């Protein structure tokens, strides 16, 4: 089975974990709980082929920025998340 590594990046508090948990568990988390790093796996069908998504939910806080290089080397796909009510989170997305 083909495996894809998806890395979810963006500023702290923009909803990376909420989006990830919605995808994995079909449940929306509405309480903010800062993430350092969480990893999830889900079997999905992409272009008619059953695949395994290995999803890495990353920390957005600046103090964890040193870990980003490792994420960028191992990731095969990236989901850049920003908050529509936080212009700075959109302007800063290029950092990821």
From Swiss-Prot:
Lineage: Eukaryota, Metazoa, Chordata, Craniata, Vertebrata
Any GO CC annotation of this UniProt entry: plasma membrane
Modified residues (N-acetylthreonine): 2
Assembly behavior: In its GTP-bound form interacts with PLCE1. Interacts with TBC1D10C. Interacts with RGL3. Interacts with HSPD1. Found in a complex with at least BRAF, HRAS, MAP2K1, MAPK3 and RGS14. Interacts (active GTP-bound form) with RGS14 (via RBD 1 domain). Forms a signaling complex with RASGRP1 and DGKZ. Interacts with RASSF5. Interacts with PDE6D. Interacts with IKZF3. Interacts with RACK1. Interacts with PIK3CG; the interaction is required for membrane recruitment and beta-gamma G protein dimer-dependent activation of the PI3K gamma complex PIK3CG:PIK3R6. Interacts with RAPGEF2.
Protein's name according to its UniProt entry: GTPase HRas
Organism: Mesocricetus auratus (Golden hamster)
Protein family per UniProt: Belongs to the small GTPase superfamily. Ras family.
Keywords per UniProt: Acetylation, Cell membrane, Golgi apparatus, GTP-binding, Hydrolase, Lipoprotein, Membrane, Nucleotide-binding, Palmitate, Proto-oncogene, Ubl conjugation
Function statement: Ras proteins bind GDP/GTP and possess intrinsic GTPase activity.
Main location (coarse class): membrane
Modified residues (N-acetylmethionine): 1
Enzyme Commission number(s) from the entry: 3.6.5.2
A GO biological process held by the record: signal transduction
InterPro entries reported in the protein's UniProt record: P-loop_NTPase (IPR027417), Small_GTP-bd (IPR005225), Small_GTPase (IPR001806), Small_GTPase_Ras-type (IPR020849)
Catalytic reaction list: GTP + H2O = GDP + phosphate + H(+)
Topological type in the membrane: Lipid-anchor
GO molecular function ontology, one term from the record: G protein activity
Keyword ATP-binding: no
Compartments, as annotated in UniProt: Cell membrane; Golgi apparatus; Golgi apparatus membrane
Binding site for GTP: 10-17, 57-61
């Amino acid at each position: 089975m083909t495996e894809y590594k998806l890395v979810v990046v963006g500023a702290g508090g923009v909803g990376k974990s909420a989006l990830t948990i919605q995808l994995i568990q079909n449940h929306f988390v509405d309480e903010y709980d800062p993430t350092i790093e969480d990893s999830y796996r889900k079997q999905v069908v992409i272009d008619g082929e059953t695949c395994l998504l290995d999803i890495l939910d990353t920390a957005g806080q600046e103090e964890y920025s040193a870990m980003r290089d490792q994420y960028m080397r191992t990731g095969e796909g990236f989901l850049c998340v920003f908050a529509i009510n936080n212009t700075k989170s959109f302007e800063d997305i290029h950092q990821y």
